[in-house]
Amino acid sequence: MIALIQRVSRASVTVDGEITGAIDQGLLVLLGVEQHDDRTKLEKLAHKVMNYRVFSDENGKMNLNVSQVGGSLLVVSQFTLAADTGRGLRPSFSGAGTPEQAERLYDEFVAHCRAQGVPTQTGRFAADMKVELLNDGPVTFHLQV
């Protein structure tokens, strides 16, 4: 399971002209599911996302997590993160989870984050989405479990 997280001042996702999720300060989480992902990997990645210290403390050091700054998550499904780009000029998605598996784990990831008390907004699974963000930094990390 892969999460590309970006520290944002604000972010939103729009589907068919309708905003489905929007946050102010927090993390935009692009979430990719791979074939062998399961609940254990989901919980490990969710814990890492929610506790990753990417926000600055009073000394300017990245030492605070999203909850400590009163931030939110915007979680967007992104199967292209599971692409194999090692050969050729066209990505292969053979390692990506099935749509059914990916949707189930995406929904569980969102529910897990919400259950931990982190305000969490979403896009719409498998939809053509328009994502807008104001990247703060920029600060971007690729997390994989």
Curated annotation (Swiss-Prot):
Coiled coil: none
InterPro entries: Daa-tRNA_deacyls_DTD, DTD-like_sf
Cellular component GO terms, alphabetical: cytoplasm
One record GO biological process: D-amino acid catabolic process
Known role: An aminoacyl-tRNA editing enzyme that deacylates mischarged D-aminoacyl-tRNAs. Also deacylates mischarged glycyl-tRNA(Ala), protecting cells against glycine mischarging by AlaRS. Acts via tRNA-based rather than protein-based catalysis; rejects L-amino acids rather than detecting D-amino acids in the active site. By recycling D-aminoacyl-tRNA to D-amino acids and free tRNA molecules, this enzyme counteracts the toxicity associated with the formation of D-aminoacyl-tRNA entities in vivo and helps enforce protein L-homochirality.
Cross-referenced NCBIfam families: D-aminoacyl-tRNA deacylase
Subunit-structure text: Homodimer.
Membership in a protein family: Belongs to the DTD family.
Protein name: D-aminoacyl-tRNA deacylase
